[in-house]
Amino acid sequence: MKYRCFVLTVSLLAFVYIDTFARKNEPSFAVIVDQEVMDNCKSALEKYAASVEADGLKTHIIVDRWNIPDSIRTVLYTLYKTDGLEGAVFIGNIPVPMIRDGQHLTTAFKMNQQRPWEYSSVPSDRFYDDFNLKFDYLKRDSVNHLYYYYSLSSEGAQSVNSNIYSARIKPPKYKGKTRFELIDAYLEKVVREKESVREISRITYFAGQGYNSNSMVARADERISLIDQFPVLAQGKGHLNYIDHTFDESVKWRLMAELSREDLDLAILHHHGAEDTQYLNASPYASMADRWLDMARKFFRGKIRSARDTIASKQYYIENYNVPESWVADAFDPERMKQDSLIDAAMDIHIADLEGFTPGARFIMLDACFNGSFHLEDYISGHYIFNPGHTVVVKANSVNTLQDIWSNQLIGLLELGVSVGNWAKEQFTLESHLIGDPTFRYVSSRKKGHDFNYAIAHRRDEVRFWKKMAKEEHPEIKALSMKILFQKGVMNPDQLYVIQTSDARPTVRLMAYQLIQQRGSDMIVPSIKAGLYDNYELLRRFAGIDASKNQSPALLDDIMLLRVSPGITKRVDFQIRRAAELYPVEAALVAYDKQLEGRRGVWYEQKREEKANLERVLAGNEKNMMELLDPKVEQRSKRFNITALRNSNQTAYLDSLFQFMKESDDQSLRLLLAEAFGWYTRSWKKCEIVDFCKRQASVETDEVVKNELLRTVKRLTD
């Protein structure tokens, strides 16, 4: 393939295009590389670019010579507007935007920004791929020069809706190998995998200890939905495998063997994580009494070892837990410590375990916290793609992430030839990232028909096309069409409610539900009510979450009915319990009693006994809100209670919060409350909060508080 090269300067960035003689209307893709990678890996880069070109994407190789995120963003935006850019990949040491004041764009990250900036900022490439977001430059890190800190501006969008997809190809630490050798080998692997031309038909999913409250119903329903999302599975032409952390005392070896299967196409791994660890088993899963005793002995040995005063700790457990001294006598014996350490290491997958490992799954989703911390020198997801084997792309998170998310949303599009990048773009959050080649895609199971990979990126404005696609039988095509038509204002909440309450396919109903909840309408509460009783666990779970965030009085009876229901599933119960604790004391207790009237049996007697604890929690919430107005209560306590509003979205005492905002002379707490109001995006009181923030901003004398109030208005109306 012939290439032509020319040099162009935009803003502060000098870059090199390596381009084919392609038609102007062809979609394009950008490869951003640092100068050293270009100098040392040019041949591999050109082969990779040629493989992307062969798949229909005009490819630009752009050399970053200035290390300035704003300039890279400018180039990408220019290509997006003028050259049909659909995605980009950052290879090597490309600047890392570290985002501040944007925690509401994450699913779970809520760290105090007073902590060191490298920890309290979110490494995010949404800076590069979402052009609706606006950022204010703050500074460059004085130690790690790749870190550039930005504040999310209130002038831009307050939700993620990426215009293009993006990914990182950044080598982690490998002993004895340079980053250039690793990049060369990886790009050669990508080219080979692109040439292999395979359909997706073999999928494995996994659940680690403690994930989604260990709900087996959640995992069973995930199987049902995956079979629905991938018709090839329903037709008996593929294979769907499930591994649970309870299958073995240490499930690690089974999971690694499964991931190394040559014929595995996709692996979806739900577990907890860190930048260097995939947490699988918290402790050995055992069913025999002798193993329970072994684990108990090991537990107390570990507690004593980690104590500041080991002698006092040992005596404490002996006296308070009746632990025999013989159980812990060898706590510091070197051989015993080694054995305990080996048991701990066998519980999880660590970076060291991946040395020489050859994963077979082409695409792996790590639905876990921190596994995608690409900004660090070493990170576990990077080892999956840079190892030998077949894995070319991983989806992972740069910081912590929420368990209760729809991680498999639209994943069946992969069966239709949609690239991993175009699929991932539909559910990017601030922390979610692709590690590897985002253009990788499986061959479509449909030999004829529309090119959905092209349509998802370049036909979004064709309303007539998506109306036609909304009539498709394939649930993922219908769900995608609904999403696009809703974004275009063509499909309304009433139409979506009909779909939510009548469609036979669980993921189609869930998409309808999710879309209704995104925009204020009279259908929000009816949608939540219907969702609470849907037969799809994930939809019920989301309805439970939204019931706790909405807190409409119209939902209270349903919440309390489910609160005492014996058939409620574990993770839905977790969400419903939270919702039940957010209402005013008297109303909540009356509703609770109402659902127990006339009910007999041990189960309901236990629920009556639980009322005392519910009343204690409700009274505690009321006390916390009232203390905001008490000048005798220390600031630290008030700060904690205000910060907690980000999660609770408490509306029962909204008048007290408004009063505090108007009357308090503590500007730091007022600023904190103004920011906390911005989390009430799904509250039944959202409009009231918006009106209050507007009025308060109009008379606010503190400029910082005023700006935060206006930012909150933007967040609640975006």
Q: For the regions a protein language model found, what residue spans apply to each?
A:
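Bacterial Sec-dependent N-terminal signal peptides
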Residues: 1-24
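Loop/turn elements at helix/coil->beta-strand transitions in domains of secreted/extracellular proteins
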Residues: 25-29, 54-59, 83-87, 197-204, ...
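Structured catalytic cores of large enzymes
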Residues: 70-249, 258-266, 273-288
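Catalytic cores of nucleophile-dependent amide-cleaving enzymes
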Residues: 121-186, 294-406
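Caspase-like cysteine protease fold
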Residues: 407-491, 506-511
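Structural detector for internal amphipathic alpha-helices that build alpha-solenoid repeat scaffolds
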Residues: 452-457, 476-488, 507-520, 540-552, ...
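Amphipathic alpha-helical scaffolding segments comprising HEAT/armadillo-like alpha-solenoid repeats
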Residues: 459-468, 489-501, 521-532, 552-564, ...
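Short inter-helical turns and helix N-cap capping residues of alpha-solenoid HEAT/ARM repeat scaffolds
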Residues: 473-474, 504-505, 535-537, 565-569, ...
